Amino acid sequence: MSLNRRILLASPLILTIALAVAANAQAKDPKQIVIGTSAGPYADQVRLGIKPILEKQGYKVRIVEFNDYIQPNFALAEGALDANVFQHVTYLDRFAAQHKLALSELVKVPTAPIAIYSRRHKSLDAVNGGSTVALPNDPTNQARALVMLDQLGWIKLRPGIDPIRASERDVAANPKGIRLLPLEAAQLPRSLQDADYAFVNGNYALASGLKLRDAQRTEKISPAYANLVAVRTPDRDKPFARDLAAAYKSRAFLDVTNKHFADYAKTDYQLALQSPGAR
């Protein structure tokens, strides 16, 4: 989620055409919702769980998949999308402030955690001087990885720092002698061919064929890193936004989550639905 405008899409032209078609269709049909997602599980959540619910209410749902963390917010702000699903509130707030975009959280979604994977080693105990550790290069997700490295004892962060804003500059000691390799989030699964260990965001891990149960250490997701649906701020109370939020909060979507996304961190409203006595 680097906050520059580098686009990692295989074909920007195809995306441009897709967005143009989506925007045009939306102008003709107010019951169409165009949702941008990162490629992989969050697109699958919409496809398997949210789209069927909304279609029963008369909506036409179009999904546009992205392979980077930059363009979905610009596309939303510019009106090519009605909503997007790929980011947590820490990233959304930072990105919106930096680029002066009026975007807001609508509802949290079940989230796949960032985790450490390795194809070279069977356990974290194999770390040694010179081990290469790939991690996200965007500020918010890099901070998550650094905090986990500090918890493992591989590095030591400066006392008193804000963990949400931790950066490589805050590494006070490196007792294991590891070499940090910051990469674009989408490149992290491929880095497992060469790196000893890699922190991979949940959506990219699953999209690349990695399984959450194969991770050697998994983050315990805090509210700051739970993924969400974002909309343009003026649209938060529009009928489509209320219906979209209600779909995510429905028992039907909880059933889809339990069937297809059982290893994900559930939202508070899903946990409430599962509690004894909930109807």
What residues fall within each predicted segment?
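Ligand-binding "clamshell"
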Residues: 94-106, 119-121, 192-194, 199, ...
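Pocket-flanking alpha-helical
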Residues: 69-100, 115, 122, 207-209
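A conserved helix-loop-strand patch within extracytoplasmic ligand-binding domains
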Residues: 106-156, 254
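Short helix-initiation/N-cap motifs at beta->coil->alpha
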Residues: 63-74, 161-190
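Extracytoplasmic "Venus flytrap"
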Residues: 30-50, 67-71
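Alpha-to-beta junction loops
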Residues: 77-87, 131, 154, 176-178, ...
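Periplasmic-binding protein-like
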Residues: 143-150, 248-268
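A bilobed periplasmic-binding-protein/Venus flytrap-type ligand-binding module shared by bacterial periplasmic
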Residues: 113-124, 226-240
